[in-house]
């Protein structure tokens, strides 16, 4: 297509699409209508299945600006097509019609968002999105998102709220007053109703959609064909099967819609209060909210109906619906830069960056804290499907297709079957013409061969193994919302684990503290709860610097904060709503020690105790809280001791981050050594700091001060040492994964040294393995980005505490020769900042680091997702196991994401384990491997079933015969369906093995297995077909034939003394038919046994009792009616009587067939991989997986791994391949 006629929307995002414009063509529409009539409606079906064909067949290309229909194509590997109709939104209905008065309602720039003020510069902006004469805006809707035409960028763009391009200053200055009713009405016209509409389709609509599936259309075609040929019984059986399948599918689909609808309907129609510009409070429905509305958060809490940024007060929020984390989160108001001591006026508001100040849609506000007369307010920033919950629901409603080689190969194999059917189709026509068969019979029989080759039961058979695996997973507490992922889990060869709560216990135990006095560490202390420390600043920090709250009288919050607070034994008291309402200011949360801990003596005259001048009651009020930020790695509070004039600032967080914000002279010289000693033992270390604030800081000023103004120039107070024990099962599970050649990677928000220590303790890194730390620094002061390579085991102290970088890893440079490094295993470790720098500036190093990267510390949620993608880019099948809190994106992105949660199902993860243990990972992989092998077995069996039956019919067509109606029925229902659904019941093998199942159907061993069985079955079937004609008793069968009585005892043939039957119009009853029917019936069972694989991925087939019973029963039944014919059975199956000696001969043919088939299949299993390439003269091929190919390259690369005391610098002008150079430091 012409490049000028193509645009790209959502550029650089996951849902990036190309867009083409079209206008409806009347003459094309007329031609298509004629084609639909001539094709009997088939063309209409084809156009329904193929949206791009439908648009191109009925429309002509047009400029995108003026088009009536848009054709969309995703730019990912799937290249999926969608079409949407252009609609026009008229602005004439808006009460204020002047374009100038509307200039502040629409946005500018490359993202369609709200304009902040109606300046002269913005007055023309409405013309970008509307025709100035008619005041109309053109838009289309795709996947619940509206895209509006933007004249500035000459493209469609989606409408945004206040979540992008709006500064924090603007939030307060231009949006905190609320909207007028006119502005509200106008924005509602653009944004529409604030709802996440998951409409449950009617049963009729779902039925039509399901019935129009290509598979069911093919079945309908088959049924009509069979009915025409008077194969009524088999046609009826297929109809019954189809009805059962459709009803089951409809029930399942509708149930999922209802569940999703119920999940999102909780906030759909709640009443909310909003503030208008004249300070009027108006009560409206939540569906009427628009970005810019100022919403009042009720005192008793609510379920948030939108995304909103908090500008007044504090909220306690449960975000478990979005994150899976049940611990309540404290949300504080967004800092107001205009009143900050140290402003951040240039900072743009972002819901992710400022998530501690953002209330997300669907989350539950449990409690609020407020000023009297100053309600708890939040400004609506996103509504409907643009909210965080809306985006989550969209990802469920419109999932990305699963890219798995098995499914691609399955479609390819179906095409092969269609090609085989085409050959049979042509052969049947030619053969029938040569034998002067009637035209009607030729058409029916030639079409019939197609329905035989492509079996109608194939889709149901393929899903059987997955359904059984899902049931087995549910029994062991693993719930699945994406069954197709089970097969993919069978291919996992790398698993990422979160640390806290996943590899280690959720709870932390306080091991002890190590205080600092006069810039020196004191000896570690285990008992914090004693009289000597009760009024120290250290304990005051532990008592106040947390986000704990009481919910229904129970102390709740982060487990680390709970352990820390419980260790000192203090009491936390929160003001009630009534108490707060009696004061002119917010009532703070108060903490105080129990009476028995307070010293009875009067305060000493030392500097420490002069702060406490009211010995009667010693209480500390928490005035302001700056919540913990994973990006900043710290939290802080402003507190005041009762009776003291000055306030105190307390801070806690990652030791490196805290030390970097403290006065250098207060940080001990041996800080790094002490920190290293603890972290290398796997302790979680938290640093504390304190600062006395100026007396001029009033209560109200503190409420609006920025955290940067507080968190600086602190006094370092010491360390809290928490013990985070490994879960009991962790080492054993990781050892099982390593034995199975499955790589394990740690992705954590904890510190580097702690993560490396835990990795060694749990066996992820073996004692003899090297750990190379990649410390990447971004470009700075004209210098290019660089990576410093260090070794984790050679840490030393930093001689200049003042130069401590919060993210720097102090490492002693190693001068030793490391020539033996290639002979030892090595692992890369890095933190989140280094990972981001490497992704941006060292793209060619990313695959190499992914090959041996084992520890990724201080990783933010989005960085975890980027890591999963980087691993997938080198062809790893990646699993992710986490607690669901910060891992939602990574869990969804991984091939197999499993969340450890008490909930039965989490929308954030394909799999959810009710048992909070990583033992679910090997269980999931085992079941995935079993399901994958089952899929292979079933597919191979169904392929052989098609070819065997296809060849049987082709042989019989050569003599103008066919299989009978009940013969088809017996084979397809009694044999095939029973075998398929029972052979899928094999449970998973009891342990993981190093061998992995193949990922696709197109592999040498698998193809050889199928082709060899096809040849064997065709050979023995042909042998029986042609050999029977050579028998001395053979003749063209007719009702008076008496071959049964020519030889053998009358006992065997007594049931066939009377062969008088009605005329056989279809020539079903003959010796060739009987021979082919018996031999082929046994062949289905033979290949079922041959293909029913057991160890090492499934339990042996003899432990599948239903399968064994079914096969034995069918064998006995077929053998019985072959050797001991029953007249009634033979009459129904249209079998003719043959001499007993021929029955024995057929039995011998079947036994030899079974021996050859099973022997060949066992040989392929045992020696196929090693012998087939040699036998075919194939040289060793380059590994298909990128990571395997890369590993071979790195084995002969003398520059890899990087040696210690070296630096990798990015070139000043980075080329497209991200080339870099190695510079050795001397």
From Swiss-Prot:
Similarity comment: family membership: Belongs to the cation transport ATPase (P-type) (TC 3.A.3) family. Type V subfamily.
Gene Ontology BP annotations: intracellular calcium ion homeostasis; polyamine transmembrane transport
PANTHER family assigned: CATION-TRANSPORTING ATPASE-RELATED, POLYAMINE-TRANSPORTING ATPASE 13A3
PROSITE patterns found in the cross-reference section: ATPASE_E1_E2 (PS00154)
Source organism of the structure: Homo sapiens
Active site (catalytic residues): 498
Documented effect of changing residue 855 to M: In PPH5; uncertain significance
Gene: ATP13A3
Name of protein: Polyamine-transporting ATPase 13A3
């Amino acid at each position: 297509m012409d490049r000028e006629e193509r645009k790209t929307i959502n550029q650089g995002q996951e849902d990036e699409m190309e867009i083409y414009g079209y206008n409806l063509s009347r003459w094309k529409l007329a031609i298509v209508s004629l084609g639909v009539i001539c094709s009997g409606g088939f063309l209409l079906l084809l156009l329904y299945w193929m949206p791009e064909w439908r648009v191109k067949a009925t429309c002509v290309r047009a400029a995108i600006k003026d088009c009536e229909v848009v054709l969309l194509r995703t730019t990912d590997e799937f290249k999926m097509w969608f079409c949407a109709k252009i609609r026009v939104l008229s602005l004439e209905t808006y009460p204020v019609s002047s374009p100038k008065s509307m200039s502040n309602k629409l946005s500018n720039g490359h993202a369609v968002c709200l304009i902040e003020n109606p300046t002269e510069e913005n007055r023309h902006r409405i013309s970008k999105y509307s025709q100035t004469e008619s005041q109309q805006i053109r838009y289309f809707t795709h996947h619940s998102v509206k895209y509006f035409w933007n004249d500035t960028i000459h493209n469609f763009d989606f409408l945004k709220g206040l979540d992008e391009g709006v500064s924090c200053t603007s939030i307060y200055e231009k949006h905190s007053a609320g909207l007028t009713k006119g502005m509200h009405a106008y924005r509602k016209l653009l944004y529409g109703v604030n709802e996440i509409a998951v409409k449950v389709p009617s049963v009729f609509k779902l039925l039509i959609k399901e019935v129009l599936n290509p598979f069911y259309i093919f079945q309908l075609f088959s049924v009509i064909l069979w009915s025409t040929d008077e194969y009524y019984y088999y046609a009826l059986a297929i109809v019954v099967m189809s009805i059962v399948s459709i009803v089951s599918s409809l029930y399942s689909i509708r149930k999922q819609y209802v569940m999703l609808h119920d999940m999102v309907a909780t906030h759909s129609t709640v009443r909310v209060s909003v503030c208008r510009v004249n300070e009027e409070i108006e009560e409206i429905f939540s569906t009427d909210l628009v970005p810019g509305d100022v919403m009042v958060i009720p005192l008793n809490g609510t379920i948030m109906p939108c995304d909103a940024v908090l500008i007044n007060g504090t909220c306690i929020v449960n975000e478990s619906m979005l994150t899976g984390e049940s611990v309540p989160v404290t949300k504080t108001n967004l800092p107001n830069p205009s009143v900050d001591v140290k402003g951040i006026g240039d900072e743009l508001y972002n819901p992710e960056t400022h998530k501690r100040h953002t209330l997300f849609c669907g989350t539950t506000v449990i409690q609020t804290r407020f000023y009297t007369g100053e309600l708890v307010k939040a400004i609506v920033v996103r509504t409907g499907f643009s909210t965080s919950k809306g985006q989550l629901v969209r990802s469920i409603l419109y999932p990305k297709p699963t890219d798995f080689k098995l499914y691609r190969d399955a479609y390819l194999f179906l095409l092969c079957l269609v090609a085989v059917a085409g050959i049979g189709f042509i052969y049947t026509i030619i053969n029938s013409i040569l034998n002067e068969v009637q035209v009607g019979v030729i058409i029916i029989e030639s079409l019939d061969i197609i329905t035989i080759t492509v079996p109608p039961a194939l889709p149901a058979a393929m899903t059987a193994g997955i359904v059984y695996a899902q049931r087995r997973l549910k029994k062991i507490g693993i719930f699945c919302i994406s069954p197709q992922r089970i097969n993919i889990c069978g291919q996992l060869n790398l698993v990422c684990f979160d640390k806290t709560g996943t590899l280690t216990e959720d709870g932390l135990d306080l091991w002890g503290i190590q205080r600092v006095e006069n810039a020196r560490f004191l000896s570690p202390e285990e008992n914090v709860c004693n009289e000597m420390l009760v009024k120290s600043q250290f304990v005051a920090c532990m008592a106040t610097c947390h986000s704990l709250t009481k919910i229904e009288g129970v102390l709740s919050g982060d487990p680390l904060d709970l352990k820390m607070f419980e260790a000192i034994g203090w009491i936390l008291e929160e003001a009630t709503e009534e108490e707060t309402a009696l004061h002119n200011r917010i009532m703070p949360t108060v903490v105080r020690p129990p009476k028995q801990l307070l010293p009875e003596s009067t305060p000493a005259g030392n500097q420490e105790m002069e702060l406490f001048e009211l010995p009667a009651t010693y209480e500390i009020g928490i005035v302001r809280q700056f919540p913990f930020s994973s990006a900043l790695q710290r939290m802080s509070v402003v507190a005041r001791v009762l009776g003291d004039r000055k306030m105190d600032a307390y801070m806690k967080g990652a030791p490196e981050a805290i030390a970097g914000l403290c006065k250098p002279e207060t940080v001990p010289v041996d800080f790094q050594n002490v920190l290293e000693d603890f972290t290398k033992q796997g302790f979680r270390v938290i640093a504390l700091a304190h600062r006395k604030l100026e007396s001029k800081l009033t209560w109200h000023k503190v409420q609006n001060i920025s955290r940067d103004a507080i968190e600086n120039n602190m006094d370092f107070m010491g360390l809290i040492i928490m013990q985070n024990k490994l879960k009991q099962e962790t080492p054993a599970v990781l050892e099982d994964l390593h034995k199975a050649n499955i790589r394990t990677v740690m992705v954590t928000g904890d510190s580097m040294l702690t993560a490396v220590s835990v990795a060694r303790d749990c066996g992820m890194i073996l004692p003899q393995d090297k750990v190379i730390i990649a410390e990447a620094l971004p470009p700075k002061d004209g210098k290019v980005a660089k990576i410093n390579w260090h070794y984790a085991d050679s840490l030393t102290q930093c001689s200049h505490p003042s130069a401590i970088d919060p993210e720097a890893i102090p490492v002693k440079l190693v001068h030793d020769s490391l020539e033996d490094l290639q002979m030892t295993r090595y692992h890369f470790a890095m933190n989140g900042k280094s990972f981001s720098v490497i992704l941006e500036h060292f793209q060619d190093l990313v695959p190499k680091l992914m090959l041996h990267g084992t520890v990724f510390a201080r990783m933010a949620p989005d960085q975890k997702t980027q890591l999963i993608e980087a691993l997938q880019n080198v062809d790893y099948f990646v699993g992710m196991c986490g607690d669901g809190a910060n891992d939602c994106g990574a869990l969804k992105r991984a091939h197999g994401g499993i969340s450890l949660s008490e909930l039965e199902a989490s929308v954030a993860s394909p799999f959810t384990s009710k048992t909070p243990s990583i033992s679910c990972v090997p269980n999931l992989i085992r079941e995935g491997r079993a399901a994958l092998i089952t899929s292979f077995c079933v597919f191979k069996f169904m392929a052989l079933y098609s070819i065997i039956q296809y060849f049987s019919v082709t042989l019989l067509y050569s003599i103008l015969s066919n299989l009978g109606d009940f013969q088809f029925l017996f084979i397809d229902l009694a044999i095939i369906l029973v075998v398929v659904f029972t052979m899928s019941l094999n449970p998973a093998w009891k342990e993981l093995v190093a061998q992995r199942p193949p990922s696709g159907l197109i592999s040498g061993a698998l193809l050889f297995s199928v082709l060899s069985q096809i040849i064997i079955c065709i050979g023995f079937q042909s042998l029986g077909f042609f050999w029977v004609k050579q028998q001395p008793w053979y003749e063209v069968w007719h009702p008076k034939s008496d071959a049964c009585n020519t030889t053998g005892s009358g006992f065997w043939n007594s049931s066939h003394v009377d062969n008088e039957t009605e005329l056989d119009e279809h020539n079903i009853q003959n010796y060739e038919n009987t021979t082919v029917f018996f031999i082929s019936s046994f062949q289905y069972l033979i290949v079922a046994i041959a293909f029913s694989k057991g160890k090492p991925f499934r339990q042996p087939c003899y432990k599948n009792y239903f399968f064994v019973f079914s096969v034995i029963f069918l064998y006995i039944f077929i053998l019985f009616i072959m050797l001991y014919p029953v007249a009634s059975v033979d009459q129904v199956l249209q079998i003719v009587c043959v001499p007993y000696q021929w029955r024995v001969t057929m039995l011998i043919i079947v036994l030899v067939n079974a021996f050859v088939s099973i022997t060949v299949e066992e040989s392929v299993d045992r020696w196929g991989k090693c012998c087939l390439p040699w036998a075919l003269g194939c040289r060793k091929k380059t590994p298909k997986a990128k990571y395997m190919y890369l590993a071979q390259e790195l084995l002969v690369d003398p520059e890899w791994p990087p040696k210690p005391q070296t630096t990798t610098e990015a070139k000043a002008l980075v080329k497209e391949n991200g080339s870099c150079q190695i510079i050795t430091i001397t």
